């Protein structure tokens, strides 16, 4: 939406995106992007200035580059069908990842400027990737966001849902906290990882 790719949410289906046009998303201006997402920043500012946040920490959220890339190029949830043809178009994936890196950093900065005290990076579809593709699609682009956020003196939580090796992810990407999915043994992961661990609860329990 913020990058001029149409999106709508359909009941029992999820997000449905329009055609990805590189010439359109690469020409998006920062001012227009921020204006489209201004309701997010205004809400964070409203919450941060209210008494509800006394002794509480406000978390800002961004989608990870890989998960956003999947939605933008697959044009729908990959849960039932992932079009893997885009793995073959290196130029397109490179260019889209560059655009995402630029505007995710803008999105992070605006959330922080309006009161977010922690940033959480959601990678809902990290588990779709094979080990050989992790450095290009997940480790490098996520590390860029983590380093940028830390440079603003803001801690980072990462949630690479379904990733095969949380230990490797933490050692490479270096988040301050890792969020695990409910299929991971929290006792085992707590022994392997030397940073705070959260999550691990089946959504059905909630």
Model-derived regions, located:
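Active-site-adjacent beta->alpha loops and helix N-cap segments on the catalytic face
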Residues: 41-42, 129-142, 182-195
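Alpha/beta enzyme core
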Residues: 49, 74-121, 128-156, 167-176
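Glycine-rich, proline-tolerant flexible connector loops at the mouths of alpha/beta enzymes
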Residues: 1-20, 26-33, 116-135
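Short, well-ordered beta-to-alpha junction loops that form the rim of enzyme active sites
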Residues: 1, 60-65, 122-124, 161
